Structure formats: structure tokens, C-alpha cells
């Protein structure tokens, strides 16, 4: 029998309608029918996309135009028998590919994490008998038996429930367990409100029941997420795009120069072809910044380590750079912007309204009347004493202190908040005994206990105010009982709801003498309201500061929550979120087309009653407006939005493994302040990357110009390919790390985010690298022209030129460390990295100039001390010229920023 799509959602159908539409019965399917449906629907498993093998992923790192230049150069060296040069050039290409391969993040892990969430076996009813079968054999129409601790094997419609509670946090992000029942529901409901459906991958926390399979494999909610994860293409970061463009520009420039010089030298200089090819190989190797990809990867890796120390784990290297360009952060509320510790802030009785101090589970903080800061004390028999004892005893949670000295609760957050409140004031000692209990249930929304309190026997009740208001006939005062005044209580609830407080009521009544059992009819008369507590999940103090820092840095913060709009706006105002005076709901977003959604995404900063699906659309809407978006999440349903965002941010504590795998960054403390800290670090790393690029490229320009001038003049080629590679890989790479350790500029969080389309090689950067490259090349050329007529050997001249270029690079590194201001500032001494790399560079230069085996390998010769002095003075003069250039071009640089 075929099972197609229902005409209306299964959660809107009764049990009988569901069974009828899916062609099943309470006795289950027959074996024959189950086999036929397995053929029709396929196995209950998520579709898998075949990933690329490791060797193909490694080879992909050679797919770069600059690497092509090196590979061709190595090949030509091989044909010409220059084995050492060939191995050195090829080694550089392989090292670059290895670094890229090691740093690469395997996106397939996120899909594998989803597949790992599926259970392996299920108990089903087939032809009236219970059978244990592999979950892969489940088909629509199977009746599945559900027990506490089970992982739901497919999407089910509940047909029988016994105190069935399910943990759906992996799917919805909401930490509270969900009470499930078999009743039909009406209207369009978000996933988290479909109380008669069970979803594949979620876990039964208590109770049991049965459900009929309504979707398997790729048709389940988990399957839809799996498909979305497969289909989403991650945006390339601005730096990755720019470096590709830079590489292609360098490649085209090299190609044009080589062709022009080949014909010029062949026609006008009558050079032998073999010598000309060697010269052009030197030119190609000189013009390619071979070390730059590796340098960028390593600088990003250092940024990753710095962020890890600040509790932000970066999973994908380019994220470090993207953080600096982020313009919008969409953040969950609970636990990220707030403490995730529900705390009572107000207690309202018929006599008095109290303020409650304290913002965590630690049982400290005074309770005092709103108009009097004097802390209250509790006396035996007072209204406050009875109220506090009621919320303490009619409560399934416990307040405990762990081994680290931190206070925690067991049980639900609402009960936990009441338990903490009761612990803030010592109650008079009293002998108590619980005799019976009605557990809390979402159907009737209250909990009740039967207690002996000393010589008194009482029934205690806590629950939703609207429910207890219907039960109460009286209200308690310190002077006795009064008739229940509902308008008074409703007015108080409305008043405190505007502050974002969630209300819970407490009541009591005398029990019958000798009563041992408690049932719902016992609560139908004589119930006395004691008071209501207003509670909230308070904002993290550090989140308030972090949001202010983000706003100062030009980054808008948007809060996404499942709360009521009024509550969300209240929390938003406490946090200092920009436009917290208005909110929009998920239902309103669902009704919008793409254009309307794009406008709303920019207009509003508070998004209430939202689902994880809304997050995905919000990311797309903001990106359509050219925003660089950071998005937080913890549930499996958040994973597509995190993968789509420019920076996906997962929670390390409450986040699922799937979400962490999909994310670019994981917060180990689930704290919004960590995001702001990561943005600061991202901006610092980008600044240092730009400084590094400005530092590396002039050296390549200078080397290329020296070779071009030599070819045009018909002179000796001043630098061999291996010497060029030494400068590009050993010298430039070593010195670049000094810039990687530079501290952030003072105004780093006072600037707006950089424009994503602003090229790292902007107008000023092009001027700077050409200016410095020309200056280094001219100084080296003049020195070479001075040395050649004096009869020095080719090895000696090359060694002097090598030392000149290296010394010029060292001084230019000092120029690059400060964008605006004198480079020899006090911060120079604070950056130990610069002095470490300077020491390493000195050791390397001594090695290549004086070690016999290095002289043989690289064709160098020993230098007298005076040439160290000469090259040092040349470098120092260039340093002063660049410092003067920074002053003269300051206005231009500010225009480019």
C-alpha cells in the first residue's frame, strides 16, 4: 500500500485519522506489507554524499596559478639537469600544499555527526507482536514502542503517551523537556509546539508510549537538515577571493614580462637560449611570493591560538579574517546574552511587593519591600514564611554546590529559581513529611503536594497564575484571609510582564485530617493564594559591555529568542541592543516574501518566537543586503543557518556535535562577550596580515626588477633561483612572523568594520609596494654597478646583494609594524616576536654566508665586516625614507580606509 503526503499535517490529525491516512492499525503492519514499503521508501537512513579522498583534497592545493609557475620552473630545471634547484623549487610547492591540506577543515564531518545521531534498533508492533528490528528497516506505518532513555528512530505521531517527556534541545535549542501527548492540534505550529510528534534523533527523558512512523530517512526533520547541509555552499571569505585575484594578476604580469624579455634578449642581446631560459626562470621565481600562502596560513593559525586562549575555538582558518569584517551578529538569548540561570526578581503578595537581589543560582541576595531597602526577616507563621516554605516544598528541584564550589540546580529552571529564592532567607526549623504528590504536567500546568508541617496538615500548590486563579477563592494576608481579588493580581502581572518577568503563583489549603492521598478534585475548593513570583533569566553583565563595544565598532547586534515579544524587548533594553523598542515574531517573518524579509532583517534587532528555520532565512536576507553575518546556535536545526552564515558560532557547552561541526567558531563558555573578544582579535590579525602582504611583495618586486635590468643591460644575472627562494622562504617568512605578534592598534574597536569588497591591495598599498620595491632595487643595482668593475667574483657580488636585500627587508619590517606613527615606538620592545625572528634571521644569514656546505649549495661567499656595515647603512637610510613617506601620505591613507 502506497503512503503519500497527507492533505494536512499529521499533528492536526487525530490518531484514527493518522492511522487511516498512513494505512496502518494499532496491531501494526504485516511482514509482507513492511517489506513492500521498505522497497517503496528505502531504508530509514540519511542519504550520504561521497566525499573526496584525501589524496584528491591534497592535490587540490596545487590548483593555484602561482604554484603552476613554480611547477613549470621546476620542470624546466629538471630538463636542464639542475637537480638542486629543481628539488628546492618543487619542495616549496609541496610545503605550501601540505600546510593548506593540514589546515583544511573537512565539511563532511558535520553530515557524519548527523548520521551518528540515529539509533541502531527499535521495538515495533507487527501483526500484534513486539519485535526488535534494525532502525534501518522501519517504514511509514510501523508502530514503535517508546521507553525512557530511547533515541527516537524516525519521525513519529504519538498514539499513546504515559507521562512522556522528550528532550528536543538537539533540534530546537530549547533546554527544557517537552511533554508529549496524542491529542490533535490546530493551526500552523512551529516544530517545538507540535506536542504530538516525536522527531528522529531526539531522546525520551521519562515516561513511555507508542508512535506510528510518519517519515523515515531523508523525509524526517533530521533528513531535511541533512539535505540542507549538503546543498549549502559556504561563501568564500573576502581575503581568499582577493588573494586569488592577486595571484592571477601576478601570473599575468610574469607571463607578459617573460614573453617580452624572451624576444628582446633573443633579438637584441643574442643570448644563448639555455642561459636565457635560466634567467627567465629566475625572474619567474623572483616575482612569485612563494612563502605568502604559508605565511598567511601560519599567521591565521597564530590568531586561532590567541582566540583559543580567550575561549573561542576557530575551526576554519579563514574565519579569523572574516571576523574582522563582520557587520552583524545574530545571537541567541538564553545562556549567550543571559546567564541561563532563571532568577526570581520580584515577589508579590496581597500585602506587599518585594524586590529580590541576586543574579545567579548562588543563594545570596536580600529580599526587601520595593519602597524600603531594609531586608526583611521571616517569622514563624507569617505570610512570607508560608509562601517561602510552599515554593521550597512543592518543588522537585534541588540546589547543590559542586566540587568547584559552583551552585547548580537539578530539575527545571522555573522550579530551580523558586528553590534558590527559598534558600536566600533561613526559615524557622520545622518537622515536615510529604505524604502525596501530583507531579507537574503541561496539560493542567500545576504541581501539588500533601504535607505534614509540624502539627498542621496542608496541601501546597505551585503553577501558572491563570490556572491557580481559577482554583483560588481566597488570598492570604498577615492579618488572615480575604476574598480573592483577581483584578489586583492581573494588574500586578501585567505591570511586571512589562519588565520581562515570567510569573509563577503559589497557593495552599488545609488538608483533611489524616489525609494520605492527593488527587485533582482536592484542589477544587478552599484554595488560598499566597503570592506570585516574577522571574527572569538575567543578562550577563559582561554581555552588556560587549554589546556596547560592538556598537562602538559599528557592528549591529540582533537578539533571536523563542520568548514572548514583550519579554524579549525588555531583555533587549537591559542589554543595550540598538533598536530594542520594537520586536518582530517568527510568524510575521514566515508571512513575508524575500524583499520584505530583507527590509525587516535590517529594521529590527529583536526577533521573538522564532524557529531555527527563521534563522536561516535571516542570514540569507542580511547577506542579500551585503552584510557580513555572524550567527549563533546550539540545536541541530541551527546547523544550516550556521553553515550559511559568514561566521557560524556554536555553543561549546549546550551545543550539539552537529552544530559544532557546522560552525566556524565554537565558544567554550557560551558567552557573547567571547564573540566581541574574537572580533577584536580578528581585526588585529587582519591588520597584521595586511602589514605582512605589504612587507613581502616589495622584496619580490625588487628581485624581479634586478633581473629585468640585468637582462635589458646584458649583464650577469644577479640572483640565482635558489638564492631567490632563500629570500622568499627563509628570510621573508621568518621576518613575517615578527609582524604576526604585533598588538592591535589603539583604535581597533572604534573603527567601523572594513568593507568586504575593499581589496587588501588598495590604491595606497599598490603605491607603497611599488615605491619600496623600486627603492630596494635601485639601491641594490647601484651597489652591484659599483662592485662589478672592481673585479669581485660573481659569488661575492651575489652575496653582497643578498645581504643588502635581507637587511633592507629587516628595516622595512620595522616600517610595516605601525600603520600610522613612528615605528620605533615603545611597543617595539613589547613585541618579543620581532626580536626572536631577528635573532633567527641573523643566524640564518651567518649560516648561508660563512658555512662551507651552504656556500656550495647556494653559491655564496664570505663577507668582510665592512660590507655588513655598508648594507646596514643602506637599510637604515631606506627605513628613514619610508617613515617620511608615511607622514607625507597620511591623508591619502585615511581616504582609502
Predicted regions and their residues:
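Membrane-water interface at loop-to-transmembrane-helix junctions
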Residues: 755-774, 794-800
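A C-terminal functional module that forms or caps the active site or interfaces directly
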Residues: 816
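Conserved cytosolic headpiece of P-type ATPases
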Residues: 1-750, 758-761, 774, 785, ...
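Generic alpha-helical transmembrane segments
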Residues: 730-731, 776-777, 799-813
Amino acid at each position: 500500500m502506497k503512503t503519500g503526503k497527507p492533505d494536512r499535517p499529521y499533528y492536526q490529525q487525530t490518531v484514527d485519522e493518522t492511522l487511516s491516512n498512513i494505512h496502518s492499525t494499532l496491531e501494526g503492519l504485516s511482514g509482507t506489507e513492511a517489506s513492500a514499503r521498505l522497497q517503496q521508501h528505502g531504508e530509514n537512513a540519511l542519504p550520504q554524499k561521497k566525499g573526496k579522498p584525501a589524496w584528491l583534497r591534497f592535490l587540490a592545493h596545487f590548483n593555484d596559478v602561482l604554484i603552476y609557475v613554480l611547477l613549470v620552473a621546476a620542470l624546466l630545471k629538471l630538463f636542464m639537469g639542475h637537480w638542486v634547484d629543481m628539488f628546492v623549487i618543487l619542495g616549496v610547492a609541496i610545503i605550501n600544499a601540505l600546510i593548506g591540506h593540514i589546515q583544511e577543515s573537512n565539511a563532511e564531518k558535520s553530515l557524519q555527526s548527523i548520521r551518528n545521531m540515529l539509533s541502531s534498533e527499535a521495538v515495533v508492533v507487527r501483526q500484534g507482536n513486539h519485535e526488535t528490528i534494525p532502525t534501518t528497516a522501519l517504514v511509514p506505518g510501523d508502530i514503535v514502542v517508546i521507553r525512557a532513555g530511547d533515541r527516537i528512530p524516525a519521525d513519529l505521531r504519538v498514539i499513546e503517551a504515559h507521562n512522556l517527556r522528550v528532550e528536543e534541545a538537539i533540534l530546537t535549542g530549547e533546554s527544557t523537556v517537552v511533554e508529549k501527548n496524542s491529542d490533535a492540534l490546530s493551526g500552523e505550529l512551529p516544530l517545538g509546539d507540535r506536542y504530538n510528534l516525536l522527531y528522529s534523533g531526539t531522546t525520551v527523558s521519562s515516561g513511555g508510549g507508542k508512535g506510528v512512523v510518519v517519515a523515515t530517512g531523508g523525509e524526517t526533520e533530521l533528513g531535511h537538515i541533512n539535505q540542507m547541509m549538503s546543498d549549502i555552499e559556504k561563501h568564500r571569505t573576502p581575503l581568499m577571493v582577493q588573494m586569488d585575484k592577486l595571484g592571477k594578476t601576478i601570473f599575468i604580469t610574469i607571463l607578459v614580462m617573460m614573453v617580452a624579455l624572451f624576444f628582446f634578449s633573443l633579438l637584441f642581446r643574442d643570448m644563448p637560449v639555455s642561459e636565457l631560459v635560466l634567467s627567465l626562470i629566475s625572474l619567474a621565481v623572483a616575482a612569485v611570493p612563494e612563502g605568502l600562502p604559508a605565511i598567511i596560513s601560519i599567521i591565521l593559525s597564530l590568531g586561532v591560538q590567541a582566540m583559543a586562549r580567550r575561549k573561542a575555538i576557530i575551526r576554519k582558518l579563514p574565519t579569523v579574517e572574516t571576523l574582522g569584517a563582520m557587520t552583524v551578529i545574530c545571537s541567541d538569548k538564553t545562556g549567550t546574552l543571559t546567564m541561563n540561570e532563571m532568577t526570581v526578581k520580584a515577589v508579590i503578595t496581597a500585602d506587599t511587593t518585594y524586590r529580590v537581589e541576586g543574579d545567579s543560582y548562588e543563594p545570596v541576595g536580600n529580599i526587601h519591600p520595593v519602597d524600603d531597602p531594609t531586608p526583611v526577616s521571616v517569622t514563624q507563621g507569617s505570610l512570607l514564611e508560608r509562601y517561602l516554605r510552599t515554593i521550597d516544598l512543592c518543588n522537585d528541584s534541588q540546589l547543590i554546590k559542586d566540587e568547584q564550589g559552583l551552585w547548580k540546580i537539578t530539575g527545571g529552571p522555573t522550579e530551580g529559581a523558586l528553590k534558590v529564592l527559598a534558600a536566600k532567607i533561613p526559615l524557622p526549623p520545622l518537622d515536615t513529611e510529604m505524604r502525596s504528590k501530583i507531579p507537574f504536567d503541561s496539560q493542567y500546568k500545576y504541581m501539588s503536594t500533601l504535607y505534614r508541617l509540624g502539627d498542621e496538615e496542608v496541601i501546597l500548590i505551585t503553577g501558572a497564575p491563570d490556572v491557580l486563579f481559577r482554583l483560588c477563592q481566597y488570598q492570604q494576608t498577615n492579618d488572615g484571609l480575604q476574598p480573592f481579588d483577581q483584578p489586583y493580581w492581573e494588574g500586578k502581572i501585567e505591570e511586571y510582564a512589562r519588565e520581562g518577568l515570567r510569573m509563577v503563583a503559589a497557593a495552599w489549603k488545609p488538608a483533611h485530617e489524616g489525609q494520605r492521598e492527593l488527587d485533582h478534585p482536592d484542589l477544587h475548593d478552599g484554595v488560598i493564594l499566597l503570592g506570585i513570583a516574577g522571574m527572569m533569566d538575567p543578562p550577563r553583565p559582561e554581555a552588556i559591555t560587549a554589546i556596547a563595544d560592538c556598537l562602538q565598532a559599528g557592528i549591529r547586534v540582533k537578539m533571536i529568542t523563542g520568548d514572548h515579544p514583550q519579554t524579549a524587548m525588555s531583555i533587549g533594553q537591559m542589554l543595550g541592543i540598538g533598536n530594542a523598542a520594537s520586536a518582530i515574531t517568527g510568524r510575521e517573518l514566515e508571512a513575508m516574501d524575500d524583499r520584505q524579509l530583507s527590509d525587516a532583517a535590517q529594521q529590527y534587532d529583536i526577533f521573538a518566537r522564532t524557529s531555527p528555520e527563521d534563522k536561516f532565512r535571516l542570514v540569507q536576507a542580511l547577506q542579500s543586503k551585503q552584510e557580513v553575518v555572524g550567527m549563533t546556535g546550539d540545536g541541530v536545526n541551527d546547523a544550516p543557518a550556521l553553515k550559511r552564515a559568514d561566521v557560524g558560532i556554536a555553543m561549546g557547552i549546550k551545543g550539539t556535535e552537529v552544530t559544532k561541526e557546522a560552525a566556524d567558531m565554537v565558544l567554550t563558555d557560551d558567552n557573547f562577550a567571547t564573540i566581541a573578544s574574537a572580533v577584536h582579535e580578528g581585526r588585529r590579525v587582519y591588520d597584521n596580515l595586511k602589514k605582512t602582504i605589504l612587507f613581502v611583495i616589495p622584496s619580490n618586486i625588487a628581485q624581479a626588477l634586478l633581473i629585468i635590468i640585468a637582462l635589458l643591460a646584458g649583464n650577469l644575472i644577479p640572483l640565482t633561483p635558489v638564492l631567490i627562494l632563500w629570500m622568499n622562504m627563509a628570510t621573508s617568512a621568518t621576518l613575517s612572523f615578527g609582524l604576526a605578534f604585533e598588538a592591535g592598534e589603539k583604535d581597533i574597536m572604534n573603527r567601523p568594520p572594513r568593507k568586504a569588497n575593499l581589496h587588501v591591495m588598495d590604491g595606497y598599498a599598490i603605491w607603497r609596494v611599488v615605491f619600496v620595491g623600486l627603492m630596494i632595487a635601485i639601491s641594490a643595482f647601484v651597489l652591484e654597478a659599483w662592485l662589478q668593475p672592481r673585479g669581485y667574483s660573481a659569488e661575492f657580488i651575489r652575496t653582497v646583494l643578498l645581504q643588502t636585500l635581507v637587511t633592507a627587508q629587516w628595516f622595512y619590517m620595522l616600517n610595516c609594524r605601525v600603520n600610522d606613527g613612528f615605528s620605533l615606538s615603545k611597543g617595539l620592545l613589547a613585541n618579543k616576536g620581532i626580536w626572536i625572528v631577528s635573532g633567527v634571521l641573523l643566524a640564518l644569514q651567518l649560516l648561508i654566508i660563512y658555512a662551507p656546505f651552504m656556500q656550495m649549495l647556494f653559491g655564496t661567499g664570505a663577507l668582510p665586516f665592512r660590507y655588513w656595515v655598508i648594507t646596514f647603512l643602506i637599510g637604515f637610510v631606506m627605513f628613514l625614507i619610508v617613515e617620511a613617506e608615511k607622514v607625507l601620505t597620511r591623508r591619502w591613507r585615511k581616504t582609502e580606509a
